[in-house]
Curated annotation (Swiss-Prot):
The keyword Ribonucleoprotein applies. It comes from the Bacteria. This is Large ribosomal subunit protein bL27. The N-terminus is cleaved by ribosomal processing cysteine protease Prp. The lineage of its organism: Bacteria, Bacillati, Bacillota, Bacilli, Bacillales.
């Protein structure tokens, strides 16, 4: 009897290297303080790339467009017209 051992398909596929499998670390952008929250001067309010939100009253803008409080007070997110937003910090009145 004649025994035929024919293989038409590879039993082992060739193993190549992948070019995937990398990802950058998240930059943790976005709001760091909420509307109505009390903050101290120097507190970071919003981390962003570009000016998604503009600095308002008592708010400064850092070199990487981070918004920070210049004084102690309460955070307020406000609208500027139809398509702009700003964040302001209003000092709390001191009771004597």
């Amino acid at each position: 009897m004649l025994r035929l051992d024919l293989q038409f398909f590879a039993s082992k596929k060739g193993v190549g290297s992948t070019k995937n499998g990398r990802d950058s670390q998240s930059k943790r952008l976005g709001a760091k303080r909420a509307d109505g929250q009390t903050v101290t001067g120097g507190s970071i309010l919003y981390r962003q790339r570009g000016t998604k939100i503009y600095p308002g009253v008592n708010v400064g803008r850092g070199g990487d467009d981070t918004l920070y409080a210049k004084v102690d007070g309460v955070v307020r997110f406000e609208r500027l017209g139809r398509d702009r937003k700003q964040v302001s910090v209003y000092p709390v009145a001191q009771e004597a």
